[in-house]
């Protein structure tokens, strides 16, 4: 399963994420096999632990009842959660975190997530989500593996670091070599000159 990042702006924003709002149904959980209750997706807890290690605080939102949301949040290792929320509540939660100066990612897969996805600094959609969610999203994770979320953040951080490193060395090279190639040493009495072809 791959990661699709829409553009360079999304790549830059993704590396700065410090807070993440996740939708429970469909994003964190699988449909109930026996109709009795949802289960966490495979590797959900592992993904949450990786995100915590990266310094990212998670907030789980759900329209479900308190007891069920609390149980799944604790099972996943998420200490911030809200229950019986409406789509507007998710949007308000993202806005409130942004007003605190946080860089917020929203992870969702449904129509009721689209408003919060549009507001977030970075919007992440699961590849099996609705067309609306994937249209709004800046990052799309192909498949249901939640470990792709920390992978996407690591990818963005490494890519931006490599771009900055390359720009630094290109600047140093040009600052030194262009004056040499232009004959600056010759102007100060040196009788050697580097050919511009070098």
Q: Can you describe what each PLM-predicted range is?
A:
Residues 5-112, 116-122, 154-157, 174:
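Cytosolic catalytic headpiece
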Residues 1, 32, 56, 76, ...:
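Membrane-embedded alpha-helical bundles of multi-pass transporters
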């Amino acid at each position: 399963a791959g990661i699709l990042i829409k553009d360079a702006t999304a790549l830059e924003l993704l590396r700065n994420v410090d807070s993440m709002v996740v939708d429970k149904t469909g994003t964190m959980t699988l449909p109930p096999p026996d109709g009795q209750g949802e289960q966490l997706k495979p590797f959900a807890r592992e993904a949450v632990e990786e995100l915590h290690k990266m310094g990212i605080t998670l907030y789980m939102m759900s329209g479900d009842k308190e007891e069920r949301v609390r149980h799944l949040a604790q099972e996943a290792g998420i200490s911030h959660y809200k229950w019986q929320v409406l789509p507007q509540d998710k949007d308000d939660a993202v806005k409130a975190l942004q007003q605190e100066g946080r860089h917020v990612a929203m992870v969702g897969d449904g129509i009721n997530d689209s408003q919060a996805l549009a507001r977030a600094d970075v919007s992440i959609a699961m590849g099996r989500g609705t067309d609306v969610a994937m249209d709004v999203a800046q990052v799309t994770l192909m498949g249901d593996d939640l470990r792709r979320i920390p992978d996407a953040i690591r990818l963005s951080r490494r890519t931006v670091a490599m771009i900055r490193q390359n720009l630094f060395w290109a600047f140093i090279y040009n600052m030194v070599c262009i004056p040499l190639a232009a004959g600056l040493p010759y102007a100060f009495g040196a009788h050697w000159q580097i050919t511009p072809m070098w």
